[in-house]
Amino acid sequence: MKRERGRRGRKRVCSFCVDKATSIDYKETSKLRKYVTERGKILPRRISGNCAHHQRMLTTAIKRSRNIALLPFSTEA
């Protein structure tokens, strides 16, 4: 059997590196919502296109924002 080759898309660029962001503020919910799915899950690096450093900062910012109820943990289904 022939093995199908996966299609690779264009490599995404880290939006925080482009803006030269030194920190990610947990109070900016509009920016954080772009990196959370409709179900409330944090988007992985391969989909969001962030570098490892900013992905870690983004994850902690989203978790902080959830803890003080600026972002929901999940949707009501």
Curated annotation (Swiss-Prot):
GO terms of biological process kind: translation
Keywords carried by this UniProt record: Ribonucleoprotein, Ribosomal protein, RNA-binding, rRNA-binding
A molecular-function term among this protein's GO annotations: small ribosomal subunit rRNA binding
Secreted found in the keyword field: no
Disulfide cross-links: none
Full protein name: Small ribosomal subunit protein bS18
Family affiliation: Belongs to the bacterial ribosomal protein bS18 family.
Protein's gene: rpsR
Function: Binds as a heterodimer with protein bS6 to the central domain of the 16S rRNA, where it helps stabilize the platform of the 30S subunit.
